[in-house]
Amino acid sequence: MVEGMLKTNFRLLFLLIFLLIPTPVLAMHIMEGFLPVKWVIFWDLVTLPFIMVGFIRLQREATQGPGAKLMLAFAGAFIFVLSALKMPSVTGSCSHPTGTGLAAILFGPFITTVLGFIVLIFQALLLAHGGLTTLGANTFSMAVAGPLVAYGVYKGLQKAGINSNFSIFLAAMLGDLVTYIVTSVQLALAFPGSSLFLSALKFMGIFALTQIPLAISEGILTVLTYNFLSRYEDAKIWVEKGEH
């Protein structure tokens, strides 16, 4: 049964967290207090509607069958673990996988927004990654923009008859990369220097050194995890839902 399998994997996932996460010296995407107040408010307001819609859909999804809550928890744990593996990058930020592609494929972008939002709160409060003042900005880049792109790419490729594994890989990879494009724009808007465009390009260029290899790795891992879940009968409900 998938329930026993998922519980076992939860233990392994959280064990990996404590084994692999380095001592946090940088924040999740954008660290606490790094953004000016006007941008804190702006990103909070922009992100709020996605969270509200996501909570409504999450409540509905949680009632769909006995394995729904476990599958949601698995998707959330996947985001938590991958987004906690950090590499230093731009000052005031860092590079890491996002893990949101899998949830976007299985549950859609709005539920993924809520899962990512919850993950960011836990990381800000318990691991000192990110912060409450930058929660809106970080949620928008990782849990709104990334999942929307991942979901759109996956659905578009599936309708075009593209191989499922390649569709999953490209969706997860591009969702990861878009997260950092948006983060670069957020940093450039807050600190434009002499040119907003050049500032954004500068941030993107620095992120690219670490993020492109990470995005490729995340794409591969997402394919492996998706195929792993598809082997279990109780998980097929959500796997097959993602394929239509």
From Swiss-Prot:
Q: Name one GO molecular function term.
A: cobalt ion transmembrane transporter activity
Query: Where does it localize?
Result: Cell membrane
What species was this sequence derived from? Carboxydothermus hydrogenoformans (strain ATCC BAA-161 / DSM 6008 / Z-2901)
Question: Membrane topology type, per the record?
Answer: Multi-pass membrane protein
Q: What is this protein called?
A: Cobalt transport protein CbiM
For this protein, the record's Pfam families field holds:
CbiM
Q: Does the keyword Lipoprotein apply?
A: no
Give start-end of the signal peptide: 1-27
Report the gene name. Answer: cbiM
Question: Biological process GO terms, please?
Answer: cobalamin biosynthetic process
Stated family: Belongs to the CbiM family.
* TM helices/strands, residue ranges: 36-56, 65-85, 102-122, 134-154, 168-188, 196-216
Q: How does it assemble?
A: Forms an energy-coupling factor (ECF) transporter complex composed of an ATP-binding protein (A component, CbiO), a transmembrane protein (T component, CbiQ) and 2 possible substrate-capture proteins (S components, CbiM and CbiN) of unknown stoichimetry.
Q: Which pathway is this protein assigned to?
A: Cofactor biosynthesis; adenosylcobalamin biosynthesis
Q: Does the keyword Transmembrane apply?
A: yes
Give an example GO cellular component term for this record: ATP-binding cassette (ABC) transporter complex
Taxonomically, what lineage is the organism? Bacteria, Bacillati, Bacillota, Clostridia, Thermoanaerobacterales
Name the keywords, alphabetized: Cell membrane, Cobalamin biosynthesis, Cobalt, Cobalt transport, Ion transport, Membrane, Signal, Transmembrane, Transmembrane helix, Transport
